[in-house]
Amino acid sequence: MIKNDTIAAIATPPGEGSIAIVRISGPEAIQITDKIFSGSVPSFASHTAHLGIVNHKDRQIDQVLLLIMRAPRSFTGEDVIELQCHGGYFSCSQILEALVSEGARPALPGEFSQRAFLNGKIDLIQAEAIQNIIAADNLDAFFIAQNHFQGHFSKKIQLISSLIVESLAFIEVLADFPEEEQPDMDVPKQRLNEAMLIIEDLISSFDEGQRLAQGTSIVLAGHPNVGKSSLLNALTNKNRAIVTDIPGTTRDILEENWTLQGKRIRLIDSAGQRETDNLVEQEGIERAISAMEQSEGILWVMDATQPPPSLPEILFQKPSLLLWNKSDLASPPQLDTSLPQLAISAKTGEGIFELKQFIQKWMQQQQLGKNAKVFLVSSRHHTILQQMRSYLLSAKEGLLAQLPPELIALELRQALQATGNLSGSEVNETILGEIFSRFCIGK
């Protein structure tokens, strides 16, 4: 499966910018680049930079900075050269065209990362993390992906694998030498229990990992016509929600992604809570209640010009903040409650800065102790770990029931293969192709 040709691609996004990078990797990377670069590329030491001119067909294309990384001390494990040229479309595209005309092949999406995987520089978990780092649209998603790329998830899988191998060795002694004195079965039982604890911890992190990667959900709730939609617009600086003086205007869930200090938040505007005979509005209210139940926090909006309303019980079951909107029209009353309260005006902007500070502190408190934890965010990883758990549970039950060792060994081998499906050592070409095809060209 390892390819021996030399590939090239533009590694930076298209469009205007100060610099662009053209990357080339493979056994002929140095020789091909030498044909278009003004210096003697074969004489350059690894991990050095050289200023020069790219020429092709008697035409000077651009002045570039050449970085050379000789195999195996490179990202792909092959000879790699990066040419840093002026930004924009034409310089990098002309350099790529020159490299291809001299023998390089245009790289496929993710092919540089795929070569790094095939050459043992990274495992499949780390390769997938590269794409997640690139695609991250908030800090939580970025740091989860960085955690995977740094190998923390892979180390857990390696530990699980070693525990399974140790258990399997004991079981295979039973199968191969049934007449001999039997080893102590407490050892494989203990090793399987240790592996199961790690697997359960990883599986249980999936929902939280998804939430962190996709963003914290905060619901704007309250009675009709208190300014929930106006607040959504004020926080996001968009006219996203329809604002009228007619109660019950919002009848469905309206969600808007919002980034606050690098943290992604899913702000959810919901239907006003009241008694109504309108079936459509009733459905909206039911959806609002469901959204509050599933959210990580609630902003309960109230009208400062109206008497204090009763508070629903759900506000005391999860992080909640009481907001007295329209404080530009009246001084808000103070409710006798343990919940924090804040006066704001979605119309004038009063209190919005303080509200953002409160939400930021809120999220920092939720984040405590999570930075070093490995979170699952991939459905592929989650599914394989569930399969692994099933195999190990069957093996444990087989040990307790004293089933034939061959049957127990079969379950352990399947669990061991599942660890290979995660790391990539047991993955076929079709799956690898599907995974790396999601990458951008040049990575």
From Swiss-Prot:
Magnesium listed as a keyword: yes
Positions of (6S)-5-formyl-5,6,7,8-tetrahydrofolate binding: 23, 82, 121, 443
Domain TrmE-type G stretches: 215-364
MF terms in GO: GTP binding; GTPase activity; metal ion binding
Recorded superkingdom: Bacteria
Cofactor binding description: Binds 1 potassium ion per subunit.
Cofactor(s) named in the record: K(+)
Compartment list: Cytoplasm
GO CC terms: cytosol
Binding-site list for Mg(2+): 229, 250
Annotated EC: 3.6.-.-
Biological process, per Gene Ontology: tRNA methylation; tRNA wobble uridine modification
Gene3D superfamilies: P-loop containing nucleotide triphosphate hydrolases, Probable tRNA modification gtpase trme, domain 1, tRNA modification GTPase MnmE domain 2
Positions bound to K(+): 225, 244, 246, 249
PANTHER family: TRNA MODIFICATION GTPASE GTPBP3, TRNA MODIFICATION GTPASE GTPBP3, MITOCHONDRIAL
Function: Exhibits a very high intrinsic GTPase hydrolysis rate. Involved in the addition of a carboxymethylaminomethyl (cmnm) group at the wobble position (U34) of certain tRNAs, forming tRNA-cmnm(5)s(2)U34.
Name of protein: tRNA modification GTPase MnmE
Gene this chain is encoded by: mnmE
